[in-house]
Amino acid sequence: MAALRYAGLDDTDSEDELPPGWEERTTKDGWVYYANHTEEKTQWEHPKTGKRKRVAGDLPYGWEQETDENGQVFFVDHINKRTTYLDPRLAFTVDDNPTKPTTRQRYDGSTTAMEILQGRDFTGKVVVVTGANSGIGFETAKSFALHGAHVILACRNMARASEAVSRILEEWHKAKVEAMTLDLALLRSVQHFAEAFKAKNVPLHVLVCNAATFALPWSLTKDGLETTFQVNHLGHFYLVQLLQDVLCRSAPARVIVVSSESHRFTDINDSLGKLDFSRLSPTKNDYWAMLAYNRSKLCNILFSNELHRRLSPRGVTSNAVHPGNMMYSNIHRSWWVYTLLFTLARPFTKSMQQGAATTVYCAAVPELEGLGGMYFNNCCRCMPSPEAQSEETARTLWALSERLIQERLGSQSG
């Protein structure tokens, strides 16, 4: 079934596995009951665990509940054009045991993006995901597209972006998904993307700043800045600046900035506690790829927090997220040492669907409506480093970012 397959729940939990001759069914109002075909009887309690259950939430996107001439509930999957008597929400049942409340959080590090969106319909919502042709960006884009959103993959490499669009359409031919050119290493490209997006005259409900570069040899962009800093921070900063009027008109809207736990292992201030530009865009002699990446991820959280402080009064919230440790993706492809490291770590990492979960959680769950200025890991709020919480550093970084953009674009126009 599509719902179970998308959620990664093809296999049944051994504890909930039914004995031979039993079948799991649901009532119209969502209660689970069990049919014993051998003895031709039904009961509310699971035959092995004795638990009562009910299904959680609405039907997955594209599904509809109907009743046949005998009064039996059945389900229509309009996306894959199939009919079944098995409720797709059975993958997401909850125990009916009000006397024993649990403190276990609803989602965690093993949750997938599709599980978070289960039962949600995003028809009419517009989502932009940068760096969406592979990895967690692709899984983020795909998850929203398969739930009805109009998704735009904002990518530098249009050939790979078009392939990503095709892969999504192969899963559902009616998905509303497209690719647009965005090179974060070139401020003019960011400008052109924003102009092209605005020309579509569509709202923007979710902007996911996902694209990043990692472990690059030292290089300067055409704008004269160190590449990791511009791609991971400044390009996204400029993109949000250019689209903030659309976000505000589309409120409630959300910005999600993909950061990393590696932000904890660096600082961007000098010994006097002042923002040090030479640490953000270092010379070749002072450059270390890992440190550059860590600093850019610290910038991501500072930017997200300051963005939330500025735009939340206008209905736009922003949160930063850590997707997961050492996930195998194309982000590491610049040096063979990192490729080897990621390969060795692969058995202990999250899947890409799990890596996209925290991003999708912050972008979609109703309980975060109107809330921002936070940092999330494994679908749970956690505190970032003290440096990342500094409002003074965030304001200074914001002002510096504005100045860098004005100087670069001003010199180019001249």
Curated annotation (Swiss-Prot):
Residues 125-414 are annotated as: Interaction with MAPT. Residues 1-23 are annotated as: Disordered. The WW 1 domain mediates interaction with TP53, and probably TP73, TFAP2C, LITAF and WBP1. PROSITE patterns: WW_DOMAIN_1, WW_DOMAIN_2. Substrate binds at S260. Changing Y33R: Abolishes interaction with TP53, TP73, MAPK8 and ERBB4. Partial loss of interaction with TFAP2C. Loss of phosphorylation. Loss of the proapoptotic activity. Abolishes binding to VOPP1. SUPFAM superfamilies: NAD(P)-binding Rossmann-fold domains, WW domain. The active site is at Y293 (proton acceptor). It comes from Homo sapiens. Belongs to the short-chain dehydrogenases/reductases (SDR) family. Phosphorylated upon genotoxic stress. Phosphorylation of Tyr-33 regulates interaction with TP53, TP73 and MAPK8. May also regulate proapoptotic activity. Phosphorylation by TNK2 is associated with polyubiquitination and degradation. The lineage of its organism: Eukaryota, Metazoa, Chordata, Craniata, Vertebrata. The keyword Transport does not apply. GO terms for molecular function: enzyme binding; identical protein binding; oxidoreductase activity; transcription coactivator activity. CDD domains: human_WWOX_like_SDR_c-like, WW. Residues 16-49, 57-90 form the WW domain. The modification Phosphotyrosine is found at Y33, Y287. This is WW domain-containing oxidoreductase.
